[in-house]
Amino acid sequence: MPTINQLIANPRKIQKSRNKVPALEACPQKRGVCTRVYTTTPKKPNSALRKVAKVRLTNGFEVIGYIPGEGHNLQEHSVVMIRGGRVKDLPGVRYHILRGVLDTQGVKNRKQRRSKYGAKRPK
């Protein structure tokens, strides 16, 4: 605990919160081109092959985006839109790729939470 004189000499510094999605530059979404599409394994208690893509954004950032939903059509040079939102069990994945936007197709046969996966309303 500092003394009063110590606090007068150098007051307490306000801690700045760091940006969790710096590549978006305060935009809701950003467009980019896939440079690599691959699968990776999650952290310790979980086990799966998670689909991710390395994306070069229009502002020059290179980020890793998660591809949500079952099945996808992405490959190298696909143009995608990313949004913020990390994947807790994949270190370094701080962005999500939007389904049903630009080159990314929506999830097939999706009945619930369709808007999250770019799926059209079933007839």
From Swiss-Prot:
Keywords: Methylation, Ribonucleoprotein, Ribosomal protein, RNA-binding, rRNA-binding, tRNA-binding. One of its GO terms (biological process) is translation. The lineage of its organism: Bacteria, Pseudomonadati, Pseudomonadota, Alphaproteobacteria, Hyphomicrobiales. Transmembrane segments: none annotated. With S4 and S5 plays an important role in translational accuracy. It comes from the Bacteria. Belongs to the universal ribosomal protein uS12 family. One of its GO terms (molecular function) is tRNA binding. CDD domains: Ribosomal_S12. GO terms for cellular component: small ribosomal subunit. The modification 3-methylthioaspartic acid is found at D89. Pfam families: Ribosom_S12_S23. NCBIfam families: rpsL_bact. This is Small ribosomal subunit protein uS12. Part of the 30S ribosomal subunit. Contacts proteins S8 and S17. May interact with IF1 in the 30S initiation complex.
